[in-house]
């Protein structure tokens, strides 16, 4: 099963992206989502190749946001698709059955659609307002996530659901009680002055409080 903690990268340049991902891996994170919008394709391929080597050294999983073609070219573990990105079935045809395909969801209908499409995991949110992402979907909060999770059947819950969007340490316990499997975090880790301590605390909360699917 996947790590319960996914880091979504930040950085306005390839150098910043590399630094943030490298330091996050060094601090103990085992799952990276490379998210770098508005980057020239050659530059992004080059960066992805470098990050792939890093993740291999740290025995960590690497997926990329949106760019199915680059996931295929560089042969990384998979891709995360937003609601307006390439259809999951098309991505599956390109990448194959052995690759991870995650999908964003903001409503119960989104979640059920993602399950039916064959996503390997679902990122549900935003939990709260965040400046990390432009054109933010309506904020769900704890109540919104709880309502969605309570509607899912046991079989539907076999697809891991990750909460995303402005999550802090103090949110983890309540989030996991909804039945969510893990969390995807960006700003909390990126802006941390002590990434190792931040990730250790997150992993402690995630693995001591949650149940394994």
Model regions and ranges:
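Hydrophobic faces of well-ordered beta-strands that scaffold small-molecule active sites
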Residues: 3-9, 32-34, 62-64, 79-81, ...
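N-terminal amphipathic alpha-helix/helix-capping segment at the start of soluble metabolic enzymes
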Residues: 1-23, 93, 210-213
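Active-site beta-loop-alpha junctions enriched in small/polar residues
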Residues: 8-12, 37, 67, 84, ...
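Catalytic cores of alpha/beta
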Residues: 20, 62-77, 91, 106-119, ...
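Alpha-helix-loop-beta-strand connector modules within alpha/beta enzyme cores
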Residues: 45-64, 83, 88-107, 138-163, ...
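Glycine-rich, proline-tolerant flexible connector loops at the mouths of alpha/beta enzymes
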Residues: 33-43, 126-137
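Glycine-rich phosphate-binding active-site loops on the catalytic face of alpha/beta enzymes
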Residues: 83-93, 123-136, 169-172, 176-205
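Catalytic domains of carbohydrate-active enzymes, especially glycoside hydrolases
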Residues: 22-32
């Amino acid at each position: 099963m996947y790590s319960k903690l996914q880091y979504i990268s930040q950085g306005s340049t390839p150098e910043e992206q590399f630094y943030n991902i490298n330091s996050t891996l060094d601090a103990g994170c085992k799952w990276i989502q490379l998210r770098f919008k508005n980057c020239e394709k050659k530059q992004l391929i080059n960066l992805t190749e470098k990050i792939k080597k890093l993740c291999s050294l740290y025995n960590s999983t690497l997926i990329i946001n949106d760019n199915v073609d680059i996931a295929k070219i560089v042969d990384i573990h998979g891709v995360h698709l937003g609601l307006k990105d390439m259809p999951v079935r098309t991505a599956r045809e390109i990448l194959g059955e052995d690759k991870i395909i995650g999908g964003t969801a903001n409503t119960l209908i989104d979640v059920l659609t993602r399950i039916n499409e064959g996503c390997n995991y679902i990122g549900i949110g935003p939990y709260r307002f965040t400046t990390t992402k432009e054109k933010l979907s309506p904020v769900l909060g704890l109540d919104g996530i709880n309502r969605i999770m309570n509607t899912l059947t046991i079989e539907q819950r076999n697809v891991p659901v990750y909460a995303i969007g402005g999550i802090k340490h103090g949110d983890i316990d309540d989030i996991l009680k909804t039945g969510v499997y893990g969390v995807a975090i960006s700003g909390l880790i990126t802006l941390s002055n002590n990434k190792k301590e931040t990730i250790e605390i997150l992993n402690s909360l995630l693995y001591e409080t949650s149940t394994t699917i």
